[in-house]
Amino acid sequence: MVSDNAQLLEQATELLLRYWVRALTSLVLVAVAYLWTKRGYQAPYAPSDIFVPSTSTYPSKVYTSRSKISVSQFVNDFLHGRIELRDAHSGRGMEHIAQVVSFRFDLTLAWRIFRTFMSTSHTEYQDKRNVEKYVTTSDSLLEQVLGPDRLPLVGYFRDEVPEELENSLAVQMERIGKEYLDLNPNDRLLDVNSQWGDLAVYLAHDYQVPTCAIVATSSQLNHATNLSGESQVQRFLRFVTGDYRAVTQCLPAGLPPFTKVLAIDALDTIGTRNIPAFLRSVNEVMESGGRFMLQVTTTPSSLGYKPNRRAFSGHQQSIMGDSDNNRAEDGDGFKIQGEEEWSEHWWYHWFRQRYIQPGADTSMLISVEQVMGELQRAGFEVIQMESLTTDAATTTAVWCNRLCAAKRQIEMELGEDAYRAWELYLNWTQSLYARGRLHKHFILAMKRA
């Protein structure tokens, strides 16, 4: 027994003498890698230039140093009221956030992404539960921020000042009816994801077009039904309760197919893997040559689930054909580079699903190029795309202003935690739109014969 131990000790000593250089080098590399992940980034601004720390935490080494703070600490401190954003009312509260907050990819983010994917299955039951939770908890807040119609439509600010959001929305709705859908009384319109029904009521009233609108919850149905009664469009408009799976219910047997279909932000909550099935179901209820219009929120192609080589640029483009004048390589302001830019994308979408809208994960994984590719595969020909990213930034800034103006009422109805979560969410969203790291588009497609 003693001899065996002596032999093992001798062998271990021999191995150590032979490989001690490699072992020491490995330990040094591991130590360097660990220290590198814990390094502090130099911040161009002091955090106190962007945050307004509360008296209980300021002065503090964390908020007065010129080293970046972690995004986990920032989100936690903000939601607990320890800090506030400067210029939050203007929507520019997160304009320089990347200068003072470190959006590095770490195990915390990896775990949160994993939990998000594991908890989001997009079954019919879970999708219904998520949208009911979102509508129930956010209804009164959305009325204060988006207006009584709660329409998440991007304004058209070519001829309007930002403060006149209602006027820009009216112009946008008119453009949808005339320029995009070209509606007339002989058409048959399907409105998927009709929200609270206001856009469907407007189109049915102004264009006298028979319309079927899909709303998600009973509260939305009650609002839409009352609005249609006030507008006296019941003979043109009917509502169906459900989600994208209810598309076929809007076309009973014996009725002619729809000539026009509208989907405002319908892709947001259906899940990336369900997009092909949704587009095929829309194709099945449309007649050949019918128009299909979508408003979509997407991620730059360099951050998408399957990055593409090309990205579209410019405000409004015709994409019939493949002209170099209509296409541009990634790098025209939309290419995302660097670890922190990539990680911020994931932190933002985790925050949105965790605190604002559960299940809204489609824009996290898909780019506008992928949406157009899925449309092509589903039997549509994409004929026009319009970038709304700049208008979306302006619209979101107006929403931020309205949120701050209604702060006291929102805190009384929903609590301070809900208000702070929405303040951070809207300012963060506006910042991503303004920096081209979140995209908004109109897409017009036509069903192929």
Model-derived regions, located:
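Substrate-binding/catalytic lobe of Class I Rossmann-like enzymes that use SAM or dcSAM, i.e.
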Residues: T298-F442, M446-A449
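Conserved SAM-binding strand-loop segment of SAM-dependent methyltransferases
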Residues: S231-Q249
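A short glycine-rich, Lys/Arg-flanked "PGG" loop and its adjoining helix->strand segment in the class I
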Residues: P276-S288
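A short acidic, Gly/Pro-enriched loop at the edge of an enzyme's catalytic core
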Residues: V247-V261
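Conserved beta-strand signature within the Rossmann-like core of class I S-adenosyl-L-methionine
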Residues: G289-T297
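Feature captures hydrophobic
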Residues: V2-S168, D182
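Conserved SAM-binding loop of SAM-dependent methyltransferases across substrates and taxa
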Residues: W196-Y207
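Conserved class I S-adenosyl-L-methionine
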Residues: P185-Q195
